[in-house]
């Protein structure tokens, strides 16, 4: 801490101090609000809404609104928000990040700004990392909101459209980051406004904000369809790469690359996690695939497949980056160690790994819609978040999201002791010391949580503990089913738990054990079903007697265990509290801080220490070469720990290097995605205007004008006249649609004697006349089937434009992805790849817009609409049609149950309209 901070306090301390007056106002209202009846307290909600409508601001009513929530929390939840929680709530309302330590009650803090901002009626989104937390929090905190007269919604995977619309229409909506993002993309693929579920992005509170906005930032949300390309090339590329010789280096520079070209086919840069073919490797590829030059544009696809194959074999490691389970390659989250079901590496890397592991290679998918979390969350007018660890990423939150961080003091002083790291020369020496430390803690009953960076290491530590006769639990991506239960009991007397990274994050580790999970286990043993148990521990309103009885039984069982563990908790405190043992420093200091933060909740004692070796990846790849040489000269043996002070600077510098590199990678992803984001905003904004019923007839007329003008100007150029042959070539694709063949024949005969401008005007006049006739024919065909005052042609224009935009936008996404994959090579030509990507991406976007306009016009001229007479004849044919000789009578058929027509289903009359928009008599008799 610098001299300025010592004298004036840290920035966070100054920010917290500045809020003292507001918190004092809230606390001053406590007695007054405590005296209110339930009805009077609930009436505050309507009072606040009225004051906002009268011109007051949210800041004006904040003290009273927070005092209302505090009193409601006491009455409904039995919890009273502490002073520091009120401070956290104000920080969130201000659109900032509140860094609050584990166990400080972040879930309750969120209710304060959520209630205040929901009073505007514009909706508040509370975003969590998984469905379980979203459901649990919405039910538990939902009781408080409902008591105060606000509605609560829940958005999780598997809900139908109607349920989601209700959830988003609520005052406060809980859900996961994935579901909010996917719903946004699905809304922007809708053809009718009735299909939309979201109603805007006004205010979001993001729980575990660092996990969602930093760790997940590089992962794009993608809605995809089945691609058409064969998977054979992935297998061919993998078979080829399997025969190549690989060389691993800490980092690749130009000289190293030259020196290794003769003895390796590809080089793996362990620091950058990249793989590159050498000159020898390129030569082998050209021979194997019988091509002249791998760099030629026509070999781009092959080159891409080979590059992904060398990355799959050289960089991606089984049981670290992914696991193979039931014939599937499943990604392991590098930060939590959890399996990421349903997620796939993009750009063909997943298929390359499938080929490497000899499992079924899935077809490459076609991207229908995509957005990164970075750009999704930047849609919100106001964004805030909570986490226990954010300060180390302060620069990134500020640069990318314009969010600043305020560290909230703990309610009770932190009693955890963070010991200095111990560093060993080799991994073998380190793991021996790890087992000895665990044994020492275990003998005195001190619970230990061992944090590892991979499945591989967690299983190695587990084997060593088994050999040492130490009973323990292992928690990694392979054994995740009982994650919360195992982590919850990690604070019991003598417990030893080995876990990958932040497994079980979000579950409190209580000293002596977690009464809630112990009660669940007992009721399960007594035969209570998981379904009933979920209801028994839930908070949703119900009048079901079985559920009410189950809740009563659960409350009694939990109370019994709370009493039992009180004594055990005292024994654990005497033993020193929870001991956090890190087996390796993570690339990010934030992840290390998260691991430490599992101990010392709410003033409990605790201890933490990291055990390192010079062979750990972070020191091997990013540590100074000088340190390694120094250790050799000192002659330190494997079992003797090194002086940590000498290495502390090197370790921190190594972590800062990696953090800086990862930040630059995420920033680079954003620079590229910002190009797509600008284009996406244009497309989605125009789509929304069309969905909202904007009359686009004038836009269609402009498209028609532009399409016809481009026919002539695009082929005439500087010529005084257009030849007959050129005219024929220019207009062939619009023959039989915009123009009749006879019209084009007549104009073609006069083309070489008509100035281009005049020819363009005459063509446009003909096209406009044809369109007017087309409109008249369609209106006649649809007569009686449209709602009064609605035009069939206007509806057709709207639907066709949306469908064409979607088709071309999907193809454009793929084209931009391909452009980005190859744009990096521009750096060799002294060009900035991002600048080139922006320039070429803009050109491609303009070409797409022109193509959309022409295709929309063409389809409006060619789409077929059945006439009322055709529909009538078809119905008669269906009734009277017989095969073979009969007496001509219609045989009576058994009555069959026909599926009910949904309001949004196409009307069976053949009009092409939704049932609710169609007015035909045949299918609307009971309407």
Predicted segment positions?
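Conserved P-loop NTPase motor core
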Residues: 1-613, 617-630, 635, 685, ...
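Conserved tryptophan-centered aromatic signature that marks the ligand-binding surface of SH3
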Residues: 912-917
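Extended, charged helical/alpha-beta scaffold domains that provide interaction surfaces
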Residues: 33, 322-330, 336-343, 573, ...
């Amino acid at each position: 801490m610098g001299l300025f901070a010592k004298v004036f306090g840290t920035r966070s301390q100054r920010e917290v101090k500045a809020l003292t007056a507001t918190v004092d106002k809230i606390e001053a209202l406590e007695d007054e609000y405590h005296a209110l009846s339930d009805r009077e307290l609930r009436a505050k909600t309507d009072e606040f809404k009225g004051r906002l409508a009268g011109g007051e601001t949210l800041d004006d009513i904040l003290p009273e609104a927070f005092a209302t929530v505090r009193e409601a929390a006491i009455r409904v939840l039995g919890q009273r928000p502490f002073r520091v929680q009120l401070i956290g709530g104000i920080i969130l309302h201000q659109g900032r990040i509140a860094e609050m330590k584990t166990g400080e009650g972040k879930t309750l803090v969120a209710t304060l700004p959520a209630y205040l901002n929901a009073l505007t009626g514009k909706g508040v989104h509370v975003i969590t990392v998984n469905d379980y937390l979203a459901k649990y929090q919405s039910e538990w905190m939902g009781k408080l909101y409902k008591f105060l007269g606000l509605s609560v919604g829940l958005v999780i995977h598997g809900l139908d459209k109607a349920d989601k619309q209700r959830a988003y229409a609520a005052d406060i909506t809980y859900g996961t980051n994935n579901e909010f993002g996917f719903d946004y993309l699905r809304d922007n693929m809708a053809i009718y406004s009735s299909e939309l579920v979201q109603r805007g992005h006004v205010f979001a509170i993001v729980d575990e904000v660092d996990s969602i906005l930093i760790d997940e930032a590089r992962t794009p949300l993608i809605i995809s369809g089945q691609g058409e390309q064969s998977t054979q090339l992935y297998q061919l590329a993998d078979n080829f790469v399997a025969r190549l010789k690989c060389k691993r280096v800490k980092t690749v520079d130009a000289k190293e690359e030259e020196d290794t070209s003769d003895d390796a086919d590809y080089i793996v840069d362990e620091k950058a996690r990249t793989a590159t073919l050498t000159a020898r490797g390129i030569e082998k590829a050209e021979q194997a695939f019988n091509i002249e030059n791998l760099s030629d544009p026509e070999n781009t696809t092959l080159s891409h497949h080979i590059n992904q194959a060398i990355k799959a074999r050289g960089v991606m490691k089984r049981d670290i980056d992914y696991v193979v389970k039931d014939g599937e390659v499943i990604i392991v989250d590098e930060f939590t160690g959890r399996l990421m079901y349903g997620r796939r590496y993009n750009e063909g890397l997943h298929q390359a790994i499938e080929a490497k592991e000899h499992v079924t290679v899935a077809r490459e998918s076609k991207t229908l819609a995509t957005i990164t979390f970075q750009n999704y969350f930047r849609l919100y007018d106001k964004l805030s978040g909570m986490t226990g660890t954010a300060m180390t990423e302060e620069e990134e939150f500020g640069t990318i999201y314009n969010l600043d961080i305020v560290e909230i003091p703990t309610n009770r002083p932190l009693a955890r002791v963070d010991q200095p790291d111990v560093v060993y020369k080799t991994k073998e020496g380190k793991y021996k010391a790890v087992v000895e430390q665990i044994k020492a803690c275990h003998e005195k009953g001190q619970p230990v949580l061992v944090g590892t960076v991979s499945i591989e290491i967690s299983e190695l530590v587990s084997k060593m503990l088994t050999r040492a006769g130490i009973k323990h639990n292992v928690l990694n991506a392979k054994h995740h089913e009982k994650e919360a239960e195992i982590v919850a009991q990690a604070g019991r007397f003598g417990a030893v738990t080995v876990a990958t990274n932040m497994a079980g994050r979000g579950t409190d580790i209580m000293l002596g054990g977690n009464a809630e999970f112990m009660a669940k286990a007992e009721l399960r043993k007594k035969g209570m079903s998981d379904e009933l148990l979920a209801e028994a521990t839930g908070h949703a309103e119900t009048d079901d007697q079985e559920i009410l009885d189950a809740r009563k039984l659960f409350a009694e069982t939990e109370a019994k265990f709370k009493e039992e563990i009180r004594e055990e908790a005292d024994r654990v405190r005497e033993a020193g509290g929870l001991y956090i043992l890190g087996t390796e420093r993570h690339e990010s200091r934030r992840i290390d801080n998260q691991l430490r933060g599992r101990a010392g909740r709410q003033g409990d004692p605790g201890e933490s220490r990291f055990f390192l070796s010079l062979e750990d990846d972070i020191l091997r790849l990013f540590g100074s070469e000088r340190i390694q040489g120094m250790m050799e000269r000192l002659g330190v043996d494997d079992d003797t720990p090194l002086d940590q002070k000498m290495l502390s600077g090197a370790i921190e510098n190594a972590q800062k290097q990696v953090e800086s590199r990862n930040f630059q990678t995420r920033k680079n992803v954003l620079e590229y995605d910002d190009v797509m984001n600008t284009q996406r905003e244009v497309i989605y904004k125009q789509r929304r205007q069309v969905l909202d019923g904007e009359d686009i007839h004038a836009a269609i007329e402009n498209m028609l004008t532009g399409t016809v003008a481009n026919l002539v100007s695009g082929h005439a150029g500087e010529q005084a006249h257009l030849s007959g042959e050129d005219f024929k070539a220019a207009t062939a694709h619009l023959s039989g649609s915009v123009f009749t063949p006879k019209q084009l024949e007549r104009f073609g005969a006069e083309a070489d004697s008509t100035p281009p401008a005049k020819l363009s005007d005459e063509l446009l006049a003909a096209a406009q006349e044809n369109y007017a006739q087309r409109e008249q024919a369609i209106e006649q065909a649809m007569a009686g089937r449209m709602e009064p005052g609605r035009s069939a042609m206007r509806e057709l224009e709207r639907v066709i434009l949306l469908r064409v935009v979607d088709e071309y936008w999907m193809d454009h996404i793929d084209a931009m992805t391909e452009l980005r994959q190859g744009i990096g090579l521009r750096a060799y030509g002294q060009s900035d790849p991002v600048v080139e990507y922006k320039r070429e991406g803009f050109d491609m976007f303009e070409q797409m817009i022109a193509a959309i306009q022409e295709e929309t016009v063409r389809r409006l001229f060619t789409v077929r609409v059945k006439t009322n007479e055709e529909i009538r004849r078809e119905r008669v044919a269906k009734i009277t049609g017989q095969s073979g000789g009969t007496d001509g009578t219609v045989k009576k058929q058994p009555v069959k149950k026909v599926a009910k027509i949904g309001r949004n289903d196409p009307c069976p009359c053949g009009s092409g309209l939704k049932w609710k928009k169609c007015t035909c008599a045949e299918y609307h008799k009971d309407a």
